[in-house]
């Protein structure tokens, strides 16, 4: 890494959490990612979701067909975990270098998660196989129970699912807790071994729930997990600038049409691929920690 008065030079970053969608939306948003990133973990929550090796191969081919020829970009594919996922299919995809990881969505926790996991015992066999072969599990860490307050769902999930079940039953499973938004998430990762890590988005480093709600609802700042109190934003900033290798870049860039955001029931997700790297760099500069930026953006990660 080289830092001069007006310039920072780092190894080309990787994005460890990205939504590209499909069709015309994929074509429109892909150039923003390839302009900045070398590789990206591609989320599988399409309609229908990516649940098989064949699905992943076809989706990867569609992504690559939209590259403009000069981009050196590698999409890393994931498998959408359902109650009926076959451990053999997961293992085959991993060994054939089609699946990089498996994505766990609690059913109905976020966009296109209705096919997600409804009961944790339903996926015990898959997680056991993943632990055995060293395959990472990517987790949307929120409790989907409507009785749980939306601002408490991440902390509840950590206390009752990750701490209470997953890390207990599968102590060697490689887990990435994606897009953490809370001080509890930071402390959980710091308290665990090297097999537990987390991604942090650019937007959760710069907005809090006042930015979303105070003085009027701003739908383009609505995402899941939802922005929290400012103390949590500050905890995220301290975590990513600490040099701890368990925290790394994952934009969770999630494009939607304007009509899908500006409606009486707007979709969750913030599109940030066009300026994510600059936002991250600004945060590191504000924290007087530019020397740690390359580790977070380009070197840490699964």
Language-model-detected regions and their locations in the chain:
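Conserved active-site and cofactor/substrate-binding residues in soluble primary-metabolism enzymes
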Residues: 24, 28, 51-54, 121, ...
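Divalent metal-dependent hydrolysis catalytic cores, especially in the metallo-beta-lactamase
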Residues: 15-16, 29-54, 70-82, 99-112, ...
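His/Asp/Glu-enriched, well-ordered alpha-helical/loop segment
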Residues: 168, 241-302
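Histidine/acidic residue-rich metal-binding segments in metalloenzymes
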Residues: 3-5, 88-104, 112-249
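Histidine-centered catalytic micro-motifs
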Residues: 12-23, 137-143, 200, 251-253
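Glycine-rich loop at the start of a catalytic domain that most often binds anionic cofactors/ligands
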Residues: 53-61
């Amino acid at each position: 890494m080289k830092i001069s008065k007006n310039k920072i030079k780092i190894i080309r970053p990787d994005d460890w959490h990205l939504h590209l969608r499909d069709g015309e939306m994929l074509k429109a948003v892909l150039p923003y990612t390839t302009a900045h990133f070398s590789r990206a973990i591609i989320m599988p929550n399409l309609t229908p979701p990516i649940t098989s090796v064949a699905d992943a191969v076809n989706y990867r081919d569609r992504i690559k067909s939209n590259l403009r020829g000069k981009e050196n970009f590698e999409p890393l594919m994931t498998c959408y975990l359902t109650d009926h996922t076959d451990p053999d299919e997961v293992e085959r995809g991993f060994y054939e270098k089609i699946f990089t990881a498996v994505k766990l969505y609690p059913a109905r926790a976020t966009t296109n998660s209705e096919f997600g996991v409804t009961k944790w015992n339903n996926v015990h066999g898959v997680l056991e196989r993943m632990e055995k072969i060293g395959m990472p599990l990517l987790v949307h860490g929120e409790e989907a129970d409507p009785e749980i307050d939306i601002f408490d769902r991440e902390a509840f999930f950590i206390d009752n699912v990750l701490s209470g079940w997953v890390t207990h039953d599968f102590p060697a499973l490689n887990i990435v807790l994606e897009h953490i938004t809370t001080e509890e998430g930071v402390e959980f990762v710091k308290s665990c071994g090297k097999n537990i890590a987390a991604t942090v988005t650019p937007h959760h480093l710069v907005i809090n729930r006042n930015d979303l709600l105070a003085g009027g609802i701003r739908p383009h700042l609505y995402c899941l997990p939802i922005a929290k109190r400012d103390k949590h934003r500050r905890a995220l900033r301290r975590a990513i600038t600490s040099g701890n290798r368990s925290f790394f870049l994952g934009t969770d860039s999630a494009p939607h049409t304007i009509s899908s955001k500006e409606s009486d029931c707007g979709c969750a997700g913030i599109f940030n691929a066009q300026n994510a790297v600059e936002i991250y760099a600004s945060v590191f500069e504000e924290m007087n920690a530019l020397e740690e930026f390359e580790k977070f953006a380009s070197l840490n990660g699964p």
